[in-house]
Swiss-Prot record:
Entries under InterPro entries matching the protein: Aldolase_TIM, PRAI_dom, RibuloseP-bd_barrel, TrpF_fam
Family: Belongs to the TrpF family.
Pfam families linked to this entry: PRAI (PF00697)
Enzymatic class: isomerase
Annotated EC: 5.3.1.24
Protein's UniProt keywords contain Isomerase: yes
GO MF terms, alphabetically ordered: phosphoribosylanthranilate isomerase activity
UniProt KW keywords: Amino-acid biosynthesis, Aromatic amino acid biosynthesis, Isomerase, Tryptophan biosynthesis
Gene: trpF
Protein name, per record: N-(5'-phosphoribosyl)anthranilate isomerase
PANTHER family xref list: N-(5'-PHOSPHORIBOSYL)ANTHRANILATE ISOMERASE (PTHR42894:SF1)
Pathway terms, separated by semicolons: Amino-acid biosynthesis; L-tryptophan biosynthesis; L-tryptophan from chorismate: step 3/5
Catalysed reactions, semicolon-separated: N-(5-phospho-beta-D-ribosyl)anthranilate = 1-(2-carboxyphenylamino)-1-deoxy-D-ribulose 5-phosphate
Source organism of this protein record: Rhodopseudomonas palustris (strain BisB5)
C-alpha cells in the first residue's frame, strides 16, 4: 500500500527543499495569520516556483473568503484546497465549482459524535483529513501537536480517500497508519523544533518512517 505523505506548514526554502527531496507527495502552505506557519502571498509565490511539479501543492485556509482564495490560487497555483475551518458541505461544493480544484476537508475529532457529518462531506469533498479537535480556547484549528483516539477510525466505511493528522511524528506515524487504515498522513508540528520552525532532519525521519510502514501494510 502506497501512503500519501504531506508535510504541512512549510514556510522556508530550505525546509521545503528537505521535504521535496525526501519524497513528500504533498507540501502544504498555511494562509491563516493566527498560525506561526502562516505565509504571505509573496513568500507563497517564491515557494511555489521552487516546488514546480515535484510535489502536489496544498493551500490551507480557515473559513477564508472567496477573494482571498482567489488570490492564493492565482499565486500559488495549488493542486488541492485544504479547508481547515468550519466550512459546511455546501461551502465545499461552492468552492469546488468556483475554482475548479479538488478539496480536502478537515474534520476535527475528539469523539465518535464528530464523525456524524462525514456522509454529507463525502458527497462534496474529494478527500477527508481527520485532525484532533482543539481545545475550546485555541486560537487555531490545528498544528497543536494533539492526537486523538485513532481507534475511532478503525474499519471506517468511507468512500473517499482519507488522511490522518494531529500529533503524528516520526515515532508514532506507523501506528497511526496501521490503526486507522488511512491512505495518507499529514504532519506539521511533529517535524518542528519550535512552533513554525520545521526541522529538516525531522522531516526526513518522518518520511522514512511513513515509507517503512508501507511494507508492513502490504
Amino acid at each position: 500500500m502506497s501512503v500519501v505523505v504531506k508535510i504541512c506548514g512549510l514556510s522556508t526554502c530550505d525546509t521545503l527543499e528537505a521535504a521535496v527531496a525526501a519524497g513528500a507527495d504533498m507540501v502544504g502552505f498555511v494562509f491563516f495569520p493566527a498560525s506561526p506557519r502562516h505565509v504571505g502571498l509573496d513568500v507563497a509565490r517564491e515557494l511555489s516556483d521552487q516546488v514546480g511539479s515535484r510535489a502536489a501543492k496544498v493551500a490551507l485556509t480557515v473559513d477564508a473568503s472567496d477573494a482571498l482564495i482567489r488570490d492564493i490560487v492565482e499565486i500559488l497555483k495549488p493542486d488541492l484546497l485544504q479547508l481547515h475551518g468550519s466550512e459546511s458541505p455546501e461551502r465545499v461544493r461552492a468552492l469546488k465549482q468556483a475554482f475548479g480544484l479538488p478539496v480536502m476537508k478537515a474534520i476535527a475529532v475528539a469523539t465518535a459524535a464528530d464523525l456524524a457529518m462525514l456522509p454529507a462531506y463525502a458527497e462534496t469533498a474529494d478527500r477527508i483529513l481527520f485532525d484532533a479537535r482543539p481545545p475550546k480556547d485555541a486560537t487555531r484549528p490545528g498544528g497543536l501537536g494533539m492526537t486523538f483516539d485513532w481507534e475511532l477510525l478503525r474499519d471506517l466505511d468511507l468512500s473517499l480517500p482519507f488522511m490522518v493528522s494531529g500529533g503524528v511524528n516520526p515515532g508514532n506515524v506507523a501506528a497511526a497508519l496501521r490503526v486507522t487504515g488511512a491512505g495518507g498522513v499529514d504532519v506539521s508540528s511533529g517535524v518542528e523544533r519550535a512552533p513554525g520552525a520545521k526541522d529538516p532532519e525531522l522531516i526526513r525521519s518522518f518520511i522514512r518512517a511513513a515509507r517503512a510502514s508501507e511494507e508492513l501494510m502490504t
